């Protein structure tokens, strides 16, 4: 099932370059493949996958290592179907409305913090080949995928990025990727439309063994208290992108039911 979904994903991703977006194009195809758990989250062996995903997105289901096996097809349908794109669109729009409501400074110190993986860049081609999060995380295989530099942009995040730049807001990318992945990350971001940024912050060795919350809090604190920036917004797919200190005026959580980072 994962390979079939990946074929649809890659084929429609190519079409997106000419037609604008890939998600709406595959909606009917995905629903033709609907297995025992459809995108409405019907019960599977006593488990509602829709309810499980809701618990994940609200940070009530925490500390999990893998997606429940019985939810693989449901998560695949969600991620490659139209609902994921619709959910992301609502969040990106609210983020833009938030910025429009602010009195932006003229000193060039207003910044917006973006996470990278599953926020600006999508690793769906990788996860479609690995059970949409059902398989345990394999750092060797995932890092090999990252080094290809082939991650596509998340369309709604790219739109938000461009709108923020048009308003004079500077962008900072704050990612859990490590410093040795800087070059490929820069190249990948630029190749899909993220052409400029104020800073790209990657995880240095001094944060080895630290939680994502501790690492990102420290970096945001430095941005505000040492560099003099004002974080007007912060968007990510993990709650660990948004919790801790110096989180910004508002935070925005994008959907991601494929993996958990605490």
Q: What are these language model-derived features?
A:
Residues 179-232:
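Substrate-recognition "cap/lid" segment bordering the active-site pocket of phosphatases
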Residues 115-117, 124, 174-177, 202-205, ...:
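Active-site-proximal beta-strand/loop segments in catalytic clefts of secreted hydrolases
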Residues 107-110, 165-172, 195-199, 227-232, ...:
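Loop/turn elements at helix/coil->beta-strand transitions in domains of secreted/extracellular proteins
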Residues 217-262:
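Acidic, Mg2+-coordinating phosphoryl-transfer loop and its flanking beta/alpha structural elements
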Residues 2-114:
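Non-catalytic pre-domain segments flanking phosphatase-related domains
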Residues 118-119, 148, 157-190, 199-204:
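Substrate-recognition element of Asp-dependent hydrolases with the DxDx(T/V) motif
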Residues 85, 105-111, 120-152, 166:
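Active-site neighborhood of HAD-like aspartate-dependent phosphohydrolases
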Residues 78-85, 143-150, 172-177, 209-210:
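Second-shell loop/turn segments in exported
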């Amino acid at each position: 099932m994962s390979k079939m979904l990946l074929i649809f994903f890659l084929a429609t991703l190519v079409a997106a370059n000419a037609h604008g977006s890939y998600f709406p194009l595959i909606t009917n195809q995905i629903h033709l493949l609907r297995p025992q758990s459809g995108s409405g989250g019907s019960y599977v062996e006593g488990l509602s996958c829709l309810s499980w995903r809701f618990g994940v997105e609200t940070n009530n289901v925490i500390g999990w290592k893998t997606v429940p096996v019985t939810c693989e097809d449901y998560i695949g349908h969600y991620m490659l179907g139209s609902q994921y794109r619709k959910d992301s669109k609502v969040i990106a729009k609210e983020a833009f409305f938030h910025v429009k409501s602010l009195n932006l400074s003229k000193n060039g110190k207003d910044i917006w913090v973006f996470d990278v993986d599953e926020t600006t860049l999508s690793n769906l081609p990788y996860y479609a080949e690995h059970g949409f999060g059902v398989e345990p995380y394999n750092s060797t295989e995932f890092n090999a995928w990252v080094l290809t530099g082939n991650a596509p942009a998340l369309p709604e995040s790219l739109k938000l990025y461009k709108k923020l730049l048009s308003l004079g807001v500077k962008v900072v990318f704050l990612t859990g990727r490590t410093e040795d992945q800087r070059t490929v990350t820069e190249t990948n971001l630029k190749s899909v439309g993220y052409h400029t940024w104020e800073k790209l912050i990657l995880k240095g060795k001094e944060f080895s063994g630290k939680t994502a919350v501790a690492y990102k809090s420290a970096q945001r604190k430095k941005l505000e208290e040492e560099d003099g920036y004002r974080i007007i917004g912060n968007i990510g797919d993990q709650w660990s992108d948004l919790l801790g200190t110096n989180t910004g005026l508002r935070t925005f959580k994008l959907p991601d039911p494929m993996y958990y980072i605490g």
